[in-house]
């Protein structure tokens, strides 16, 4: 799709969407996004130029269908997939990708740490994906030194980061915000450091007594990203891993650094979004979103959850969707889904489905609350179909049509019930939606009430 679009850009020193936007150019990607979002193309360009919106679109991911992440666009959902040393393989991950796209994932992150050749898995996912692909290069950097964190060098990190960029990765989580001086701040936490990438870098700094190499070499990463139009997803290494640890000094110290790094990337026209927590009580979610906007100059916020309670293993797609809906309402640009397997194991296909649907609900609810143009149109259409007992239309408009039909057909499977004016909940005699009040009846009632009012006066 994008082959012709990017052909003329190849060989230029800076090919980022932000670079073109700041030159006043509306790229084909911006035009495409404008149509998808039903927004003016020049507004898209302005938002990208300001850094309030990103269009993650590596020039080597030519089958990508461009999309936007930002406060002016619809709230987006990311799905995580990825093989581990103990579970899954290349084909399973491609299948998960296809399932995630089917159920509405706006972006997909490949978090593979094993299960085969990581380069082959990543390439297969990118080649099959119409949505932006994100990665965490620290994982493969660690694999390249056979799991011995102390042996990692800055060059190891940069080599893997460039490899991912060359392969067509659209955004990379870069854990550059965790600094050596932040580490003592985790003493009072219950769960310490829960970011895998953050944990790797923390151990490296503790061993070498040196500053985070991703921080000291941030300019080198910028130069790589400029050449391929890779977006930063600045990782929150010190995100809280439980509600007790939310909004603490460690989290906020890193957030301040992430804001500084955001502005440094913007100096070179490189796109940025900022990752956020995590586990956050409901009363702290608004603070967290507004604090990020303040510290990071309104760069798009991308949050994991957040989970609003810690006591529901097996149901964390629910505990987190509650927080995600609130975060989206307050202005978060993208929600990273959580599956029922969170904290318990690697998600399978059904877990991916359940997590995604929970988060599509959260994002859609946020769009309605934020009064996005047309956000409620689908709800209204489904409500009309429900009132008219148009069962097939209800299924069609559902976020998960297969599940809706499956539940309906558990008790009333015959085709005749697809036109019935009841379901198995109320049966044929007690459904309140059978009470159809026509306009003539209401007019007569209004006349009667008016006369009654005159008599009372």
Swiss-Prot record:
GO MF assignments: 4 iron, 4 sulfur cluster binding; carbon-carbon lyase activity; zinc ion binding
Reaction(s) catalysed (UniProt annotation): 5-amino-1-(5-phospho-beta-D-ribosyl)imidazole + S-adenosyl-L-methionine = 4-amino-2-methyl-5-(phosphooxymethyl)pyrimidine + CO + 5'-deoxyadenosine + formate + L-methionine + 3 H(+)
Entry annotated with the keyword 4Fe-4S: yes
Domain of life: Bacteria
Pathway of action: Cofactor biosynthesis; thiamine diphosphate biosynthesis
An example Gene Ontology CC term for this record: cytosol
Residues binding [4Fe-4S] cluster: 423, 426, 431
GO BP: any one term: thiamine diphosphate biosynthetic process
Keywords noted in UniProt: 4Fe-4S, Iron, Iron-sulfur, Lyase, Metal-binding, S-adenosyl-L-methionine, Thiamine biosynthesis, Zinc
Record-listed substrate binding positions: 80, 109, 139, 175, 195-197, 236-239, 275, 302
Cofactor: [4Fe-4S] cluster
Name of this chain's protein: Phosphomethylpyrimidine synthase
Taxonomic lineage of the native organism: Bacteria, Bacillati, Cyanobacteriota, Cyanophyceae, Nostocales
Gene: thiC
């Amino acid at each position: 799709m994008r082959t012709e679009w990017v052909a003329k850009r190849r060989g230029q020193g800076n090919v980022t969407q932000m670079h073109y936007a700041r030159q006043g150019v509306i790229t084909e990607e911006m035009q495409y996004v404008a149509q998808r979002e039903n927004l003016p193309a020049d507004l898209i360009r302005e938002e990208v130029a300001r850094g309030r919106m990103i269009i993650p679109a590596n020039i080597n991911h030519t089958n990508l269908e461009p999309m936007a992440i930002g406060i002016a666009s619809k709230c987006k959902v990311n799905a995580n997939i990825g093989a581990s040393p103990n579970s899954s393989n290349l084909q399973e991950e491609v299948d998960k990708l296809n399932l995630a796209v089917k159920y509405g994932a706006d972006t997909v992150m490949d978090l593979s740490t094993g299960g085969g050749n990581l380069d082959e898995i990543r390439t297969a996912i990118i080649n099959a994906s119409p949505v932006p692909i994100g990665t965490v290069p620290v994982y493969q950097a660690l694999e390249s030194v056979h799991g011995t964190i102390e042996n990692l060098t800055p060059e190891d990190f940069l080599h893997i980061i460039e490899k991912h960029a060359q392969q067509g990765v659209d955004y990379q989580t870069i854990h550059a915000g965790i600094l050596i001086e932040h580490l003592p701040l985790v003493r009072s936490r219950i769960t310490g450091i829960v970011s895998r990438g953050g944990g790797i870098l923390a151990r490296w700094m503790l061993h070498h007594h040196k500053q985070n190499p991703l921080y000291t070499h941030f300019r080198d990463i910028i130069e790589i990203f400029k050449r391929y139009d890779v977006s930063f997803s600045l990782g929150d290494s010190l995100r809280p891993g439980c509600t007790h640890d939310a909004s603490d000094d460690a989290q906020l110290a890193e957030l301040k650094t992430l804001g500084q790094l955001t502005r440094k990337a913007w100096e070179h026209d490189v796109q940025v979004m900022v990752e956020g927590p995590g586990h956050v009580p409901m009363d702290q979610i608004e603070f967290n979103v507004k604090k990020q906007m303040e510290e990071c100059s309104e760069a798009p916020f991308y949050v994991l959850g957040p989970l609003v309670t810690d006591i529901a293993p097996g149901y964390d797609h629910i505990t987190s969707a509650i927080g995600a809906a609130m975060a989206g309402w307050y202005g978060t640009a993208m929600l990273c889904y959580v599956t029922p397997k969170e904290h318990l194991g690697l998600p399978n296909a059904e877990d991916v489905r359940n997590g995604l649907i929970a988060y599509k609900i959260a994002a859609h609810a946020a769009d309605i609350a934020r009064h996005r143009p047309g956000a409620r149109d689908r709800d209204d259409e489904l409500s009309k179909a429900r009132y008219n007992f148009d069962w097939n239309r209800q299924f069609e408009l559902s976020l998960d049509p297969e599940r809706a039909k499956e539940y309906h057909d558990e008790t009333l499977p015959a085709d005749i019930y697809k036109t019935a004016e009841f379901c198995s909940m109320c049966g044929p005699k007690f459904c309140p939606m059978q009470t159809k009040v026509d306009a003539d009846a209401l007019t007569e009632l209004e006349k009667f009430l008016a006369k009654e009012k005159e008599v009372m006066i």
